[in-house]
């Protein structure tokens, strides 16, 4: 297991499993969210806040986050923020 990235409100995602991070306001993103709800592959990590980004994982899970895609991309690229943990020993 690699690095865990904070996606908001104490929720963590393994960065080794992330395929893409996109903004949630496009029509294709909204369709993917609807499809994820239907197929029960959606994980809502927004804590009731507005969804701002959608994270796709390699095991076909769709994760919703209340953080901006730019914020998540910065954390993904190594600009460590509070709540990011390295699990490699």
Features from the language model and the residues they span:
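Short glycine-enriched loop/turn motifs at secondary-structure junctions
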Residues: 13-16, 56-58
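C-terminal structural segments of small proteins and small subunits
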Residues: 54-89
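Short aromatic-glycine motifs in intrinsically disordered, low-complexity regions
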Residues: 1-12
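Short, structured protein-protein interaction patches enriched in aromatics and acidic/basic residues
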Residues: 44-58
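Phosphoinositide-dependent membrane-docking surfaces
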Residues: 15-23
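Amphipathic alpha-helical interface surfaces
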Residues: 14, 28-29, 35, 51, ...
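Compact, glycine-rich, soluble single-domain proteins
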Residues: 26, 30-39, 44
């Amino acid at each position: 297991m690699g690095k865990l990235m904070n996606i908001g409100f104490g929720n963590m995602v393994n960065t080794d499993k992330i395929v893409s991070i996109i903004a949630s306001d496009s029509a294709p993103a909204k369709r993917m969210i609807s499809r994820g709800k239907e197929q029960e592959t959606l994980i809502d990590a927004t804590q009731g806040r507005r969804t701002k980004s959608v994270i796709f994982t390699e095991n076909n899970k769709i994760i919703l986050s209340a953080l901006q895609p730019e914020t998540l991309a910065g954390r993904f690229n190594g600009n460590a923020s509070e709540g990011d943990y390295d699990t490699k020993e």
